[in-house]
Amino acid sequence: SFEEALAASRLDSRYIPFTCPDFDLTDDEMMEKLKRDIAMGAKGLKIHPIIQNIEITDKRCERPIKLFGELGLPITYHCGVNDYYKPDSPYLKMTNLNYGKLDYTFELLKKFPDYTIVPAHGGGSCGGELEALSAEVRKHNYKNVYVETSHRGAADILKAVELFGEDRVMYATDWPFDTCDCNIRCGEEALGNDPVAMDKYFYKNA
């Protein structure tokens, strides 16, 4: 929860607390909660289109995105066509894995070209998303698109730096689906020979 992330950040300033919209609330209640979270120290917004069962371009996402975007705070969200539930889970029918498609990101960037946007997993880890996302960023000259490399190996981290530049790629973990140690090792393997790039990846770009 945001409250747990906030508590951790007060114990260790290296933690950067993000919050997320609660779509079970009314729109006004949701926005008031997000405004309170920002006042308490939320530094960014996280949305999970598949688990929260909502398109990132849905009107219910627009107000939270605008709130954070206009304040210059980053917006991140899951990218990738992924199942999260077993075939016999009742929750499987309550989600739509296609909400993770990269097309939604392209639409979002066209609508909010100046916001700081961080598509998770480099746009998705099914194959080809890094290249497609970087091509779209270059085509439209988006200045504030970053990628994080959770669920990515050393080769993909190097590819991300090549495609986006060392100032726009950052470390992340997809815990509990992977581990912090695994992601750290991949980052060190990819960038260990370049201390400047590695410092940006693990710390400064965030």
Range-by-range predicted roles:
Residues 32, 40, 158-159, 163-170, ...:
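Mid-to-C-terminal alpha-helical segments outside catalytic/metal-binding sites
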Residues 44, 58-170:
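Catalytic pocket-lining loop regions of alpha/beta-barrel enzymes
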Residues 8-10, 136-140, 190-192:
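Short, conserved catalytic or adaptor-binding loops enriched in Gly and charged residues
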Residues 174:
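Active-site glycine-centered loops adjacent to acidic/histidine catalytic or metal-binding residues
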Residues 14-16, 116, 146, 200:
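Conserved beta-strand segments of alpha/beta enzyme cores
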Residues 3-6, 106-107, 158, 185:
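Active-site phosphate/pyrophosphate- and oxyanion-stabilizing loops and adjacent acidic/basic residues
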Residues 2-3, 99-103, 181:
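Short, surface-exposed alpha-helical segments at coil->helix boundaries
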